[in-house]
Regions:
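A short beta-strand-turn-helix
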Residues: 57-77
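N-proximal helix/coil linker or "cap" segments that precede and/or mark the start of modular domains
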Residues: 32-56, 70, 124-127
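Thiol/disulfide oxidoreductase modules built on the thioredoxin-like
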Residues: 129-131, 138-184
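Structural microenvironment flanking redox-active thiols in thiol-disulfide oxidoreductases
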Residues: 91-129, 142-149
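Conserved redox-active cysteine motifs that mediate thiol-disulfide chemistry
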Residues: 73-74, 81-98
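Active-site acidic short loop of glycosyltransferases
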Residues: 73-75, 105, 131, 153
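Bacterial Sec-dependent N-terminal signal peptides
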Residues: 1-38
Length: 186
């Protein structure tokens, strides 16, 4: 911090205006951190709590096969609830893809659960954004999808990490929390 402060004051001087600008910038950074923490408090309240058994489900994949959560028992599974029409979901794809790249070779399974209702649009988004991890869907709106009801998904993107014992390790809307958890446990 001394280096940043030194550089800042070298550039902007040591006057009251410079000190005020520095304080405002610091406060904005703190607000951003607090706002991010508030996202879970606002949007992840109905997702399964850590330590509860993750509900099993079976959904259709893009290639027409079925995928069940129970297929991956004994592994960490990251459930990525999303949709192609969701701007926040699209914004998070690079971070989720980065998580996949960093942890899939360590045995972590990533599974996209889409709330798209149009298979062509869903598939186009998967191809356009080069999403590498398996995808599944009921092709129903979020409020109508059984998997959304099972997991209490009210907001997307939402992420649920299921531990090898089948219990929820983390439920969040903040992808960086998934990285922190996997980095700690894997």
């Amino acid at each position: 911090m001394n280096m940043t402060r030194t550089s800042f004051f070298k550039v902007y001087g040591n006057g009251i205006v410079a000190k005020t600008l520095f304080l405002v910038a610091f406060m904005l950074c703190m607000q951003t951190i607090n706002a991010q923490e508030d996202l879970d408090a606002k949007y992840a309240t109905e997702l399964p709590k850590a330590g509860t058994v993750a509900p099993d489900f079976t959904l259709s994949s893009l290639d027409g096969n079925t995928i069940s959560l129970s297929d991956f028992k004994g592994k960490y599974v990251v459930l990525d609830f999303w949709a192609s029409w969701c701007p926040d979901c699209i914004r998070d794809i690079p971070e989720i893809q980065s998580l996949y790249n960093d942890f899939s070779d360590k045995g972590v399974v990533f599974l996209g659960v889409s709330f798209d209702t149009d298979k062509t649009r869903w598939q186009t988004a998967v191809e356009k954004y080069d999403i590498k991890y398996p995808q599944c869907s009921e092709l129903k709106k979020m409020r109508e999808a059984e998997v959304a009801k099972l997991y209490g998904v009210k907001w997307i993107p939402s992420l649920v990490v299921v531990a090898p014992d089948g219990k929820v390790a983390l439920s969040t809307v903040i992808s960086q929390k998934v990285r922190a958890l996997l980095s700690e446990r894997i």
